[in-house]
Amino acid sequence: MSDHKIATREEWLAAREQLLAREKEHTRLGDELARQRRELPWVPVEKEYRFDTDDGEKALVELFDGRSQLLVYHFMFGPSYQAGCPVNSSMADTVDGVLPHLHARDVTFLLVSQAPLEKLRAYKRRMGWRLPWVSTAPSDFNFDLGFSYTEEQTREAVAQMRATGLTIQSSATGPETGTGLPPIVEHNARSTGTDVAGYLTESPGFSTFVHDDDAVYHAYSTTWRGLEFLMGYYPILDHAPNGRDEGDAWQQWIRRHDEYGE
């Protein structure tokens, strides 16, 4: 039997009122953070980035598709990957169904990855997504924003971590293994069909851009736990009696939606 506290209805109502006050405080703080996010200064994008798309090679400004705001998810699918990252895939699942609502608010949302376009197309068909997905292969877009690295860079970093015992553990990557690499990294590397160094050429991220007065501006970027707003199942699980219930297996339970039950 669970050792969870059992209460009367009156005791529950009193505790619920206390929690409600904290929930309202959390909501107000979220509103304030959203306001501050909107007020961040914009940085002009002066480099001419090119992307491979289903309609041929395009410039960054063309990706807005006639809207004034462009939201980009830096999806972890590197050149050596055979499949997309399962955690990133779960985020795409969340966003895919809300595209019409975003378009209604003058927002274009798309995925960008380093892998060749044909790989992205095949994986998109498998997942059944409608999300537009473009390859950054023709340009340094992902590298310049800090979400892609060369395999030489990652192999050197991984070798150094394993040789010295250094770790990349943080609140962003989950519990340490003692080997310098969190379990989620090795787990997802296997899942994407590459090795650790190949997997770490990519980092997850979210960036926003504005098209205003014939110029494009970079407005915002975030990564790691800053991406949880795209993981629609997490706030739902946070309201479940057992919460996320991940323990030390941080995000290792996440599968592609066609792999549960295997």
Cite the ranges covered by each PLM segment.
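Non-globular targeting/processing and membrane-anchoring segments
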Residues: 1-70, 75-105, 122-128, 132, ...
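Catalytic nucleophile loop
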Residues: 103-120
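Residues at the C-termini of beta-strands that transition into short coil/loop
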Residues: 113, 135-137
